[in-house]
Amino acid sequence: TTEFMHALKRRSDYNLYDPRTGEVCGTLNSKRIFDLIGLMAWKNGDPGIVFLDRMNNERSNPTPNLGVCETTSPCGEYPLLAYESVILGSVNLSKHLKGEGSAREVDFEKLGRTVHLAVRFLDDATELNGFPLRQTREIVSGNRKIGLSIMGFADLLFMLRIPYNSRKALNLAEKIMEYIQTEARASSRELAKERGVFLNFDESLLKDKGAEYKQRNATLTAISPTGTISLVASCSPSIEPIYGISFLRKTARFEFLEVNPYFEEVAKEQVFYSEEM
């Protein structure tokens, strides 16, 4: 995948390899393929891109002695070893603001409390979960991976009046995720003091990283698509922009006209809202 992304940056062709022999068997234009991937993902949600090389770097696979990551969780957000599974959960960022109007800002204190509670919740869920196979129970109990994600990021930007495709939005995303990662690790360290580190800790790369990484869970965060749970929480999905200001959602029995509440709020503030619109 790294070779493809470098080719895409250069807008050049990339090689196709025979999986059996490893020999080059053709080439394709990287930009044409990437544009097609983006178009089809927008139309129906597939395909996604799996970075096989990144899946097995030090951060993604802290237990290389136990094997390589060869699969993912159902939505592709989490690299996993053979037979492994992971408990996922997401924080609704749009509920972590303080102030009003132009004085609104991210409430990091509240976000920190939520992250600590969420890590404990996900570790509890790992403990109570049932497993269909012995191999799955052993590897999950051994690594205790959890995936704390986010949703409502686009909603957060709406309320802060920050354009989604701006450098300011990217900087805020980086600041938020760095904070979540830091607090998630702190919470996992607290759990390790109470309940012990994960069973495979001594086989992991974290063992030699010092006290900061003496944690309950081998891995902590993810970026899940949250397509379904964001509907339940009435917020924008994951880190994605909204699908549309207004659209028709169809189910097996009903059709729903959905209008983005933040657009409606601005329309009323600026006095251009109407039912006909």
Where are these regions (language model features)?
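Active-site cavity-forming subdomains of large catalytic enzyme subunits
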Residues: 1-93, 97-108, 131-135, 188-190
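Short acidic (Asp/Glu) and glycine-rich catalytic loops that position anionic groups and cofactors
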Residues: 12-17, 85-101, 129-133, 150-169, ...
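Short beta-alpha connecting loops at secondary-structure transitions
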Residues: 19, 73, 103-107, 135-139, ...
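Internal maturation/activation junctions in enzymes
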Residues: 21, 114-137, 141, 162-226
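Generic beta-strand/beta-sheet core signal
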Residues: 50-53, 69, 89-91, 151, ...
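Long, charged, mostly alpha-helical binding arms that flank functional sites
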Residues: 83-148, 158, 276
